[in-house]
């Protein structure tokens, strides 16, 4: 089965939604599921469940490309000599520690979450709840100075605590970046360091989630399914590059409250539409 023009447009739109919402703390999975309620892909439910996760690989690639110098643990002086960047290695060990809680909980409860919590009402409630949290936390932080200003300042204990907050993002509508940023802000991490650690944490977390979904689905793709994945990931990559640049520039001068208000408004709209 070949993709028709309308289906290609749907995939492009979903890629745009993924690229925008993956890095802003507004829940990419929640937005993808909501969009699917109105613009449904003509694919099996099993494929769509996998697609909504694996499309994140495009967004991951954008982070790797943009933060390569910070992420790559080696620095080459010349063709035959390289220097190990100890701070980068240390940071990756901290990221690994932060990944453990969500990896365990994701494997244990993936089927339950997919079966019971992927609903518009759950998404709406989580959008509103975490929107309120963003506003409350940012108002509280006006009178406080961050105790952890840079990535290098993040301790193993802080990394683990951020990882525990990431578990909350398994509930659709929460937002992986939203949960980790809220957790980081609560324990005294600066906005910029919180966002950067979230980007680092996204790489193994989303690679692991994508691999898990691919293994569950199997690798027996039709040509249409494979094309859907490629288009979705390519669009998500391109859009993510611009969104990451915007977010890092934005949070240097502004707080996250605007995203909190957006979440609240969207959550209320979803509840109203669902009730009609």
From Swiss-Prot:
<comment type="function">
    <text>Catalyzes the dephosphorylation of undecaprenyl diphosphate (UPP). Confers resistance to bacitracin.</text>
</comment>
<feature type="transmembrane region" description="Helical">
    <location>
        <begin position="6"/>
        <end position="26"/>
    </location>
</feature>
<dbReference type="InterPro" id="IPR003824">
    <property type="entry name" value="UppP"/>
</dbReference>
<keyword id="KW-1133">Transmembrane helix</keyword>
<feature type="transmembrane region" description="Helical">
    <location>
        <begin position="181"/>
        <end position="201"/>
    </location>
</feature>
<protein>
    <recommendedName>
        <fullName>Undecaprenyl-diphosphatase</fullName>
        <ecNumber>3.6.1.27</ecNumber>
    </recommendedName>
</protein>
<keyword id="KW-0378">Hydrolase</keyword>
<keyword id="KW-1003">Cell membrane</keyword>
<feature type="transmembrane region" description="Helical">
    <location>
        <begin position="117"/>
        <end position="137"/>
    </location>
</feature>
<keyword id="KW-0961">Cell wall biogenesis/degradation</keyword>
<keyword id="KW-0133">Cell shape</keyword>
<dbReference type="GO" id="GO:0009252">
    <property type="term" value="P:peptidoglycan biosynthetic process"/>
</dbReference>
<dbReference type="GO" id="GO:0008360">
    <property type="term" value="P:regulation of cell shape"/>
</dbReference>
<feature type="transmembrane region" description="Helical">
    <location>
        <begin position="49"/>
        <end position="69"/>
    </location>
</feature>
<feature type="transmembrane region" description="Helical">
    <location>
        <begin position="224"/>
        <end position="244"/>
    </location>
</feature>
<comment type="similarity">
    <text>Belongs to the UppP family.</text>
</comment>
<dbReference type="GO" id="GO:0071555">
    <property type="term" value="P:cell wall organization"/>
</dbReference>
<keyword id="KW-0472">Membrane</keyword>
<keyword id="KW-0812">Transmembrane</keyword>
<keyword id="KW-0046">Antibiotic resistance</keyword>
<dbReference type="GO" id="GO:0050380">
    <property type="term" value="F:undecaprenyl-diphosphatase activity"/>
</dbReference>
<feature type="transmembrane region" description="Helical">
    <location>
        <begin position="151"/>
        <end position="171"/>
    </location>
</feature>
<feature type="transmembrane region" description="Helical">
    <location>
        <begin position="89"/>
        <end position="109"/>
    </location>
</feature>
<feature type="transmembrane region" description="Helical">
    <location>
        <begin position="256"/>
        <end position="276"/>
    </location>
</feature>
<keyword id="KW-0614">Plasmid</keyword>
<keyword id="KW-0573">Peptidoglycan synthesis</keyword>
<dbReference type="GO" id="GO:0046677">
    <property type="term" value="P:response to antibiotic"/>
</dbReference>
<dbReference type="GO" id="GO:0005886">
    <property type="term" value="C:plasma membrane"/>
</dbReference>
<dbReference type="Pfam" id="PF02673">
    <property type="entry name" value="BacA"/>
</dbReference>
């Amino acid at each position: 089965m070949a993709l028709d023009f309308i289906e290609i447009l749907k995939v492009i739109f979903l890629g745009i939604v993924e690229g925008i919402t993956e890095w802003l703390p507004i829940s990419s999975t929640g937005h993808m599921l909501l969009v699917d309620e109105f613009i449904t892909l003509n694919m099996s439910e099993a494929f769509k469940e996998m697609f909504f996760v694996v499309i994140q690989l495009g967004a991951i690639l954008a982070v790797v490309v943009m933060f390569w110098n910070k992420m790559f643990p080696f620095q080459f002086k010349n063709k035959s000599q390289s220097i190990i960047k100890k701070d980068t290695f240390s940071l990756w060990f901290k990221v690994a520690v932060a990944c453990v809680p969500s990896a365990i909980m994701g494997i244990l409860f993936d089927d339950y979450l997919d079966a019971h919590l992927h609903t518009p009402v759950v998404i709406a409630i989580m959008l509103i709840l975490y929107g309120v949290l963003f506003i409350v936390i940012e108002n509280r932080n006006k009178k406080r100075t961050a105790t952890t200003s840079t990535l290098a300042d993040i301790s193993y204990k802080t990394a683990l605590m951020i990882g525990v907050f990431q578990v909350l993002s398994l509930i659709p509508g929460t937002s992986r970046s939203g949960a980790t940023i809220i957790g980081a802000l609560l324990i005294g991490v600066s906005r910029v360091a919180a966002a950067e650690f979230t980007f680092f944490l996204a790489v193994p977390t989303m690679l692991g989630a994508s691999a898990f979904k691919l293994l569950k689905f199997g690798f027996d793709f039709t040509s249409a399914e494979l094309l859907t994945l490629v288009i979705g990931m390519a669009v998500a990559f391109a859009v993510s590059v611009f969104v990451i640049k915007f977010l890092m520039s934005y949070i240097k001068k502004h707080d996250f409250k605007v995203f909190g208000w957006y979440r609240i408004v969207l959550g209320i709209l979803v509840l109203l539409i669902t009730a009609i």
